[in-house]
Amino acid sequence: MTARFAWLLVGVLAGAALVAIPWESTSDAGTGPATIRITDRLLSLKRVDIGARGTSPGDVEVVRHRLYDRTRARNVIGRAELVCHFVDTRRSRSCRGTYILPRGKIVVGGAIQYHQFYVLAVTGGTGLYDNARGTLTVTRTARRPVRDLVVFRLAG
């Protein structure tokens, strides 16, 4: 009878341990409310003309930036890569991009009409920015060389 009770106790404890294990993986890397202010410098802007000559729907724009610490302008902290598809014959583009920072990546997306000022949605990230949500605001600060103020407002 004692052996049976011991095995029953082991079974109950094992079952309780299985119930305590979460079935869905969640991240502990929540970013919480935060504002990140950095600057960038344009490295390259390439256009791929697809279809009709000149700007037309489907044309692709590939943009690369070097990212800098705002307080120490010479300190490179990462890079940004965006791919945009033109949706009309003027300036409207649908863009997706990744900002690679020292502690993770931030993924953004949305519409850009002018490179001088735009706001994109933060749709996720990795590392410290896992599951990040919020907005990215980019404001042009210089034309030659092209420099921008980059502000992430993260909600979590």
Where are these regions (language model features)?
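Beta-strand-enriched cores of mature, soluble protein domains
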Residues: 28-156
